[in-house]
Amino acid sequence: GSNIKVSCFVDSGVPVLNGSNLEGFSLSEKTFRYVTREKADSLNKANAHRGDIVITHRGTLGQIVFIPQDSKYDRYVISQSQFRVRCNDKVLPEYLVYYFHTPIGQHKLLSNASQVGVPALARPSSTFQQIEVVLPELSIQKRVVEIISTIQKKIVNNQELNDNLYAQAKAIFDNHFINIDAIPAG
C-alpha cells in the first residue's frame, strides 16, 4: 500500500482506495479521496487496476474485493492498509475473491493475523502467496463466477429497490405526519 499524507489529497485525479471502498465482493465507488496523476505515478507499486484484487491487511481484516472491468476508473491507489494481488492465467480473480469470502478462505486468509493493537496480517504479500488454494479448471471457475455474480446482481438490484421503497415511504410519512400544513383542518 501507500503512505499518503493528508496534504497530498486533491479535489480530483486518481482515486485512493480505503476500507470503506471494500464492501462485500466488489469495489464500492460511492466516495473517494484523490491524488494527482503525478503522485499516483510516484506510488506505482500501490497502483491497482481493473482485474486486480485488493485486500485489507490492517484494520478490518478479511476485506477482499475485485476491481471489475467496468469500474468507474481504470486506476486506483491503494492505502497503506491494503495490498494488491494480480492473478496469473490459472485463476480468475473473481473466483479467488469468492473463494476468500467462504469460511475456509477467510480462515486461510486470517490464519496469520495478529490481534494485538490494530488487527493486522504479518507480512501480507508473502503470506498471501503461500496460501494453498485448490483450483478447479478455468471452465469450472468461470461457471462458478457466472452463478455467483448473477446472484450478486440480483441482491444489488433488490437492495436498490428496497432503498427506493424506503425513500418513498419516508416521503409519504414526512408529508402526512411531519408537514402539519398538509393535514386538513377538522
Task: Locate the predicted segments by residue.
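Sequence-specific dsDNA recognition surfaces
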Residues: G1-S7, S20-I53
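Short, Lys/Arg- and Gly-enriched loop/turn segments at beta-strand edges
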Residues: L61-P68
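Short peripheral tails and domain-boundary helices/loops at the edges of structured domains
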Residues: K72-Y95
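A short glycine-rich beta-alpha junction/loop motif
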Residues: R75-F83, S114-V145
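Glycine- and charge-enriched low-complexity intrinsically disordered segments
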Residues: K90-S111
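Amphipathic alpha-helical segments
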Residues: E94-L96, S126-F173
